[in-house]
């Protein structure tokens, strides 16, 4: 029998028509991205610290976490976005590590954290780095606030070099009645614009996204040169309109140098790790959906059509088809370059393993336009 069946046994003798239904070629689902909110615990809250719960709106947050940072963050996040699933966990005595341990293996694509002390930043960076690695692949991007003078923000930027952490630089922000916003409220509005945009299209730039309900009351805004320096130090920036409304300018990651200490812009914008996560998940979903129980044969093997067998060239063809599809969606570019560099081969030491090396080129955002006008008379 050439066709590989999963349910109909080869030794069946009872008369009948037995037809399997296989959905392995039909998966086109997009992953539902989730947000985790982390804030300080308050006395008397219904939900104990280090307990993750679904928390979809401000009222739910107040019932579960009282008048806390978490409630404030839900309020301002929901001013920006109404649909992203939100979970929350509270931290007791600044012990963020214990709260992170409570997450288990559940993936949260975006993490909104009001705590920004050195220990939290370090613990969160280590946690995110581990979840980004190949053996876990449950990554996320964290958004943290920092309010201060320009000099204080520049100094703070050196606290982390994690490509999965994005700091928001805060000057003086308020609500529509000019009531000062807390850092938690400000960064929630920031993440409320950034996270849903990345979920919808990880490559699309984020400048000019308006933070609803947020206004500047600063007597002096950071000028171009100050914001440019902040961006070089791993601190994200915003701009202020003539009506004092606040817009996202450029959310960058904290990653500014490589292991050798040399300046490195490979993870400059948050779109880059977001796109890398998206691309990897697409590849994993493809292989697991189509070839979850296939046999593996070397190139040139002659096998009957319908057999659940895969070869390196079949895998390569599927990866190329996926890349072409993602190119059409505006996620990647240079298909011919990708095709030339893609290597798919059997492992020399483990014949049940296939290895591949590819070099995708992600589509970038249009962030800077430079021109030179040479006029004539």
Each predicted region: which residue ranges?
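Surface-exposed assembly/interface segments
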Residues: 1-377
């Amino acid at each position: 029998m050439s066709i590989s069946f999963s349910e109909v046994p080869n030794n069946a003798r009872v008369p009948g028509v037995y037809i399997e239904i296989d959905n392995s070629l039909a998966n086109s689902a997009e992953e539902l991205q989730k947000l985790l909110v982390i804030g300080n615990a308050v006395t008397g809250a219904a939900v104990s610290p280090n307990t993750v719960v679904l928390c979809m709106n401000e009222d739910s947050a107040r019932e579960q976490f009282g008048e806390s940072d978490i409630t404030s963050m839900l309020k301002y996040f929901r001013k920006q976005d109404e649909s992203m699933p939100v979970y929350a966990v509270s931290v007791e005595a600044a012990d963020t590590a214990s709260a992170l341990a409570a997450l288990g293996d559940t993936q949260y694509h975006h993490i909104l954290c009001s705590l920004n002390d050195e220990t939290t930043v370090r613990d969160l960076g280590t946690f995110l780095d581990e979840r980004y690695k190949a053996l876990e692949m449950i990554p996320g991007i964290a958004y943290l606030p920092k309010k201060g003078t320009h000099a204080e923000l520049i100094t703070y930027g050196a606290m982390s070099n994690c490509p999965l952490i994005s700091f928001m630089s805060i000057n003086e922000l308020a609500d529509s009645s000019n009531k000062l916003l807390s850092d938690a409220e400000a960064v929630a509005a920031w993440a409320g614009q950034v996270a849903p945009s990345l979920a919808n299209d990880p490559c699309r730039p984020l400048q000019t996204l308006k933070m609803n309900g947020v206004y500047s009351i600063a007597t002096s805004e950071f000028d171009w040169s100050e914001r440019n320096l902040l961006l070089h130090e791993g601190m994200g920036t915003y701009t202020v309109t003539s009506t004092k409304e606040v817009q996202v300018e450029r959310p960058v990651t904290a990653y500014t140098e490589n292991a050798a200490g040399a300046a490195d812009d490979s993870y400059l914008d948050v779109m880059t790790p977001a796109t890398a996560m998206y691309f990897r998940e697409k590849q994993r979903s493809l292989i697991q959906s189509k070839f979850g129980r296939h046999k593996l044969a070397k190139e040139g093997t002659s096998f009957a059509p319908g057999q659940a067998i895969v070869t390196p060239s079949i895998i390569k063809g599927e990866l190329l088809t996926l890349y072409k599809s993602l190119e059409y969606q505006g996620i990647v570019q240079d298909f011919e370059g990708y095709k030339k560099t893609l290597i798919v081969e059997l492992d020399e030491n483990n014949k049940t393993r296939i290895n591949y090396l590819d070099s995708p080129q992600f589509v970038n955002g249009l962030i800077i336009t430079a021109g030179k006008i040479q006029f004539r008379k």
